[in-house]
Amino acid sequence: MTPPAIPAAPPATGPAAATDPLDALRARLDAADAALLDAVRTRLDICLRIGEYKRLHQVPMMQPHRIAQVHANAARYAADHGIDPAFLRTLYDTIITETCRLEDEWIASGGAPVPTPVHASASARGAVS
């Protein structure tokens, strides 16, 4: 993956001038991190809805074919965008482990909220019915 060109630093007029481009890049990184965290939270909330569907319809929590599909999608994305596929596999393994844990707890609780932040936020917003 090749990073985009970075604008040339302004003429040095002191320590602050040298950090302005870095500060701007860090601000963009912070915004990207906020979007990433919101996307993860949204994904976890959706997985709780899936857990509720599975609970109501007696669908097994573990769906190996779905996990394989998610990994295949990530591998395709990695290939298309020059990202290390092993990195995305590790990232998705972590995400999938957490979503399976949440779904399993949701199903085992009979749909009652369990004491984790994502459950509390989902219940408070009415995200899980």
From Swiss-Prot:
One of its GO terms (biological process) is chorismate metabolic process. This is 4-amino-4-deoxychorismate mutase. Its EC number is 5.4.99.67. Pathway: Antibiotic biosynthesis. The keyword Endoplasmic reticulum does not apply. InterPro entries: Chorismate_II_sf, Chorismate_mutase-related, CM_dom_sf, CM_II_prokaryot, Isochorismate_pyruvate-lyase. The keyword Isomerase applies. SUPFAM superfamilies: Chorismate mutase II. Residues 16-107 form the Chorismate mutase domain. It is an enzyme of class 5 (isomerase). GO terms for molecular function: carbon-oxygen lyase activity; chorismate mutase activity. Keywords: Antibiotic biosynthesis, Isomerase. Involved in pristinamycin I biosynthesis. Probably catalyzes the conversion of 4-amino-4-deoxychorismate to 4-amino-4-deoxyprephenate. Pfam families: CM_2. The gene is papB. NCBIfam families: CM-like (TIGR01803). It catalyses: 4-amino-4-deoxychorismate = 4-amino-4-deoxyprephenate.
